[in-house]
Amino acid sequence: MKKISVIIPIYNASNSIKKCIESIKIQKYKNYEIILVNDGSNDNSEEICLKYQEKNNNIKYIYQKNMGVSEARNNGILNASGDLIYFMDSDDIISPNLFDTIINNFTDDVDCLWFNYKKIYNYDNQWNAEYDVGKIRNTIINTSEFERKVLVEDDGFLWNKVYKLKLIKDKEIFFNKEISVCEDLLFNMEYSKYINNIKKCEYIGYAYFQSTSSSFNKKNNLKWFSILEAYQILESICVKTDIRNFIEYNALYYQCEGYARNKYNTIKFSKNISRVKIYDKKSLKILFSKNISIKKRMKLALFIFFPNLVFRIKQRNIKNKKY
């Protein structure tokens, strides 16, 4: 029976880590290990983790000085001993039968398992529906379709995918420690270079906790600008024409937002962000690309012409939880 290694980076997660761990402990499938990587928390996360480690021989606890989520996950990979690897965030929870679903569907011909998730705003009664794990509809997709969906549908997340640990270690697929946002997208695109079959399950296995006080989208969050660096890396490594179009579209879109963010920040991003011009060769290429939907092209055109206005509208909608 395949062993599942669950890696959970932790930073000041004392209010949520218990719920996260308990959602794993209630799994019917028991051949798993939990690797808790404390990234230099200054709350009582360590105390909570040590108590769980003391009472559960399948829980490993690792402390590292604050080096970021990418290094925490890399540390988890190096200490994992399972066949399959699964990444969680410390404030999220999983379905009670997720591991059964993983084992039933991650057959020998599958290189990556991909399932659905939902956003939640509290932890109460999130899994009322019972699934018959033997009757979940699934399809096999190839690498190109996987990459396209990850980019077009903004689904570069880790926590709704399961990977082969041996492949990750053999190919040395690790997280870029210089990137703090979109590091998961880079990981998925790198992993896709070495695989053939991805199984997509129509099953909601993960609950992503959406905090209304999250600082990520706030206009003065400098970590946001890591997105621009991530897409520069993607542009440099991607050679597939159809996939590259989507990467270039996203890169232009985020450049427009970065330009507007840099204008509104009281603390400026260290690198100059030029305004995207409609007549630039790259802009024209994407705006007339048939691979990109008309809706997306119109959205980009508006952002190019009116970056500050679109950014202000986007910020207002985020505040109202409509975006």
Where are the language model's segments positioned?
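Short, well-formed alpha-helical segments that are part of the catalytic scaffolds
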Residues: N12-I26
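Membrane-interface aromatic/basic loop that binds lipid-linked glycans or pyrophosphate carriers
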Residues: T266-Y323
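A conserved acidic beta->alpha catalytic loop
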Residues: S23, N38-I48
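Donor-binding/catalytic cores of nucleotide-activated saccharide
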Residues: V69, S90-I198, Y206-W224
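Short aromatic/hydrophobic "clamp" motif used to bind/position activated sugar donors
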Residues: I85
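Short beta-strand/loop segment that forms part of the nucleotide-sugar
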Residues: N31-G40, K60-K65, D89-S90
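Catalytic core of nucleotide-sugar-dependent glycosyltransferases
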Residues: Y203-S211, N217-Y249, Y253, G258-S283
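Glycine-rich, basic loop-to-helix element that forms the pyrophosphate-binding segment
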Residues: Q64-A80
